[in-house]
Amino acid sequence: MKSTLLNMTAVLFGITLIASAGVGAVNMITAEPIAQAEQAAKTAALNGVLPAFDETAAETLTIDEMPITVYTATKGGQLAGYAVESMTKNGFGGAINMMVGFTPDGEVINVNVLKQAETPGLGTKMADADNVLLRSVKGQKLEEKKLVNGKLAVAKDGGDVDALTAATISSRAYVEAINRAWMAYKSVATGATPTDVSSGATSAAGDTAEEQTSGPEAQEGGQNE
């Protein structure tokens, strides 16, 4: 009986050891391709919001308790622009991540939405090329926009950023992430002290109640301008 128990223990130990070795080997094999894919995705995102560059230096700031990374891009030793990897947790479907490009003097070059889980056909349009949100900021210096308490805001909240049709919550979240990127850009480019960006993405009480009584496809549809 004792011998059988020892044999079973030895077998189980051997199986566990082999399984652990197998998992470790798989991790070693897949780690490099995953890292390469992540780097390729980041390079593509930077290329999408910056002019030609050959080097970047990254600096991560904390704004609203979130990590916001600023990439200072140079070409031939000359400043080419800044790319800011920004985010918000206040999208209708959760977190939204984006890359925002700025010229050295603060003009928005482009915005590339990297991750979002908004309502298909409504909030997801923020990732479309030439959508109304992007048109409201691209090629412009944000300090020259109609600001509310020093920040960008959608028209419904007193600003001049056009919101996506029937997707006010998503639009507010997009603008919040842009504001956070702008704050980070100013901190790195001009030395301004970064301050938290008060959320404009949380819906008003009436908006929330309207969403809760709507069907899945109509949830953001209840937020018509």
Language-model region placement:
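Flexible, solvent-exposed loop/hinge segments and secondary-structure transition points
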Residues: 2-225
